[in-house]
Amino acid sequence: MALPPLADEAIVLGAVADNWREAVRAAGAALADSGAALPAYADEMIRMIEEHGPYVVIAPGLALAHARPGPEVLHNGLAVVTLQTPVNFGHPHNDPVSVVLGLAVADAEAHLASVADLANVFNDDDAIPALAAATTADEVKRIMGISL
């Protein structure tokens, strides 16, 4: 299975966020702008982190914001948000975060497949710093291994 679609509208470079909630909200807005999710999906992603802690910070500098499949998800989609200034999520080892991925999937099977595919992308130690430094949507897609 390939990564979920990554529309140009879902790539936000140099976003300003004062805290992790604003960073996650930026990822949710990018998913909404791409048509993958409703704006309320950002609230669901934030709620998951409030309930379960900073488990979404999956590697140094990288958060994978997501929520359960539900009515807020319109179709599978991915968002990439780089932050002008990194923010802390409260993770003991992987803060601060400079790249927030937003993941919206319609079912649990797609969720597992998407996470596995993303893990393959980030097996490359250079991927996170490269994304954080990216200046164009095409550059982000190249780093993510998505055909242009």
Report the location of each language-model feature.
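Cytosolic covalent-transfer regions centered on His/Cys nucleophiles
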Residues: 1-148
